[in-house]
Amino acid sequence: MPISYNKASVVVSLQSIIANYRRIRTVAQRPMPVIKSDAYGHGLEAVGMALEAEGARECAVGTVGEGAKLRKAGFGADIVALLGALDREDAQLAASSGIIPTVLDIAGLERLAAQGTTERPVRVALKFDTGMARLGFTEHDVSALCERLRTLPSVRPVMAVSHLAVADDPTQSAFTMAQGAAFARIMAGLRSNFPDIMGSLSNSAATLAHPQLHWDVQRPGIALYGSNPLRGTALARHGEGLLPAMSVSVPVLQVHPLPAGRSISYGRTYTATKDATVAIIAAGYADNYSRALSGRGVAVAGGRRVPVLGRVCMQTTAIDVTDVPGIATGDRVWLLGGPGPATVSADELADLWGTISYEVLCLLGMNPRRHDDSVE
């Protein structure tokens, strides 16, 4: 549920997302933007509509409900629901909204078949497990699956999808290529029965760095939002030039001195070693600013990097503003992004947080949000 009770401000740059999409288009023939989980916190409807206007032929969401919400907003291109139709209500909604759900098993296939007709079959995407050990059919199911599909004219398979486990790690390229080989065998079996079925295997990392795994449709996700999935690896150059799309700022509640020898916040985990000035900002773990950032986080105040002091509280956090002249109550402090070279990236914040940029964006993006709609 979106957070609505605080004074945080999330600003999403649609222009940056479109720039990243264009960057991806230079290496991918048919990228299907992944906008699940509220577009990784960036706003499902706004991001989806901007990408459709830019020429995206389809987008991928997580649930059928997300897809229906996007369709209701006026999205006219194809929508693939990656988690599939989880129950009968989902199956009905997918059929009525023209959403393409993934199918994970025979029961799900039959659930969807009940919603279609021979004249108006429900389009589906077949989900295969090639190494994630998570969801879907296996390579050994292809023959029996095709036999069952031939008896169900009320469904039409239009795509087969699988997901790569370590495409972002070149030290495990053998596993990635093994997944690719398994998917190739799956596609051969499917196309002997359904010649027009499309294949989709590549995530952001594979889209950027492994063209041999592109197949017909590519599924960039985190790269759309400015995070390099290959950061810190020998393949990092393939993800350079992506633009961050989210910034998060909060107001200063109070500025006061912290004399040498005085502690601050719960647990007294920080004691000033010299006279300092602190600002208490309106952000805490209830605002999805993690308690793991206690004594580790950084923020941008007055154009400068400043450290978090002591423990992050439920709705407040202390920062050291000793070297930020003139800072006052009501000024904005950036938890993510921020003006000038001091900006904090999602990847950097994730490192401090002990997580990944995906979680940072999904969680902070739940705060009050607006979009910069200027797309050139």
From Swiss-Prot:
InterPro entries attached to this UniProt entry: Ala_racemase, Ala_racemase/Decarboxylase_C, Ala_racemase_C, Ala_racemase_N, Ala_racemase_pyridoxalP-BS, PLP-binding_barrel
Signal sequence annotation: none
PANTHER family, per database record: ALANINE RACEMASE, ALANINE RACEMASE, CATABOLIC-RELATED
Entry-linked NCBIfam families: alr (TIGR00492)
Location of the active site: 36 (proton acceptor), 266 (proton acceptor)
List of residues that carry N6-(pyridoxal phosphate)lysine: 36
Residues binding substrate: 134, 314
The UniProt record lists the keyword Isomerase: yes
Superkingdom field: Bacteria
Coiled-coil regions, chain positions: none
Keyword Zinc: no
UniProt cross-references to Pfam families, sorted A to Z: Ala_racemase_C (PF00842), Ala_racemase_N (PF01168)
Reactions listed under catalytic activity: L-alanine = D-alanine
Catalytic EC class: isomerase
GO BP terms: D-alanine biosynthetic process
GO cellular component: cytosol
Record-level Gene Ontology MF annotations: alanine racemase activity; pyridoxal phosphate binding
E.C. no: 5.1.1.1
Lineage: Bacteria, Pseudomonadati, Thermodesulfobacteriota, Desulfovibrionia, Desulfovibrionales
Gene name in the database record: alr
Family to which the UniProt record says this protein belongs: Belongs to the alanine racemase family.
Cofactor(s) recorded in Swiss-Prot or TrEMBL: pyridoxal 5'-phosphate
Protein name, UniProt field: Alanine racemase
Pathway in which the depicted protein is active: Amino-acid biosynthesis; D-alanine biosynthesis; D-alanine from L-alanine: step 1/1
Keyword set, alphabetical order: Isomerase, Pyridoxal phosphate
Job description of the protein: Catalyzes the interconversion of L-alanine and D-alanine. May also act on other amino acids.
